[in-house]
Amino acid sequence: MPDPGNRRLLAFDFGTRRIGVASGQEMLGTGQPLAMLPARDGIPDWQQIEALLADWQPDIVLVGLPLNMDDTENEMCARARKFGKRLHGRYHVTVEMVDERLTSYEAKGEVMAGGGSRDFGRHGVDDRAAVLILETWCREQAG
């Protein structure tokens, strides 16, 4: 694995209908949206995940953890953790969970500020939320 500061990152914003994906470099501290993968009750097309991992070859995979505002966990936290464990178990990648409170809210704000569609049911923001998860992790590493 490369030295801290030089790692390739892939971030996932787990959801039951869609899973947002972003990539980035720790050195730059920024990410770019890659994809919004369809999911059926939180179960992705694992072949799509495998293809992304093969293409991007991340050193660390980040999975958003949607904690409550009082730091407690909820059902979605358990599902996101399970998704992270499956990523590690299937593909033997290093997985880190990242506090993602308010990332979807912030991503929706960015879309609306840019004049984008407010129909988030059809036009999700999950890939943008994954960017925010990645950037949050980078800021935490930088101290």
Swiss-Prot record:
Its EC number is 3.1.-.-. InterPro entries: RNaseH-like_sf, YqgF, YqgF/RNaseH-like_dom, YqgF/RNaseH-like_dom_sf. The keyword Hydrolase applies. The keyword Hydrolase applies. Keywords: Cytoplasm, Hydrolase, Nuclease, Ribosome biogenesis. It is found in: Cytoplasm. Its main location: cytoplasm. GO terms for molecular function: nuclease activity. One of its GO terms (cellular component) is cytosol. CDD domains: YqgF. Belongs to the YqgF nuclease family. Could be a nuclease involved in processing of the 5'-end of pre-16S rRNA. This is Putative pre-16S rRNA nuclease.
